Amino acid sequence: MGRKWANIVAKKTAKDGANSKVYAKFGVEIYVAAKKGDPDPETNSALKFVIDRAKQAQVPKHIIDKAIDKAKGNTDETFVEGRYEGFGPNGSMIIVDTLTSNVNRTAANVRSAFGKNGGNMGASGSVSFMFDKKGVVVFAGDDADAIFELLLEADVEVDDVEAEDGTITIIQLQLDLHKAIVALKESGIQEFNVTELEMIPQSEVSLEGDDLATFEKLYDALEDDEDVQKIYTNVDGF
């Protein structure tokens, strides 16, 4: 698990650094979080959480500030959260979370991405029941036992703590994610590679050859949609 998250973080960071679409997606998410509550991250924990994630993805400060300033203004633009589920080749499954100001456009685009790239849309719940919502925290370190004990002392329920290649990965209950981050920061850990709520598959599949190529094409088509915020899958390495 530790190596998986380290590899995903490295691959995603490399892509995000050159992808303005990622900046735009975080801009929307920051705007929505700021609009729902106080635009000050020090008093709005949801906003602070999004900003921290944006920084992990190397989103420039001016993008973050612009989204917050927009939320402070008189704009009444409304965004709606959505979730779509579907299937790719050879047992692969995908969950797509969206944030959009035009639900009809988003639904049509997601359906088209599945249909044109070797996938099939499923009904609500057809995939998500095979995933568990968990908190994931990744940071530099090598003493998993010490971190496990620290979290237990902070009354954080932990599923797993692994140390591999100088990286510690924590998987824990979604409701304890904020508590885990606070406990880690109080212990002196300030830099994180990942602090996310994730849908983690109960089992994974490995794809090769044409199946892998088809899946990558489908995944990229969904990821390129400006309304798609997150993609979860049971395919190893994604």
From Swiss-Prot:
Q: Which InterPro entries match?
A: Integrase-like_N (IPR017856), TACO1_YebC-like_2nd/3rd_dom (IPR048300), TACO1_YebC_N (IPR049083), Transcrip_reg_TACO1-like (IPR002876), Transcrip_reg_TACO1-like_dom3 (IPR026564), Transcrip_reg_TACO1_YeeN (IPR026562), YebC-like (IPR029072)
Which parts of the chain are coiled coil?
A: none
* Cellular compartments annotated: Cytoplasm
How is this protein annotated for GO cellular component? Answer: cytosol
The molecular function GO annotations come to: DNA binding
Single GO biological process annotation from the record = regulation of DNA-templated transcription
The record's NCBIfam families line, in alphabetical order, gives: PRK12378.1 (NF009044), YebC/PmpR family DNA-binding transcriptional regulator (TIGR01033)
Family, similarity comment: Belongs to the TACO1 family. YeeN subfamily.
Q: How is this protein named in the record?
A: Probable transcriptional regulatory protein SSU98_0387
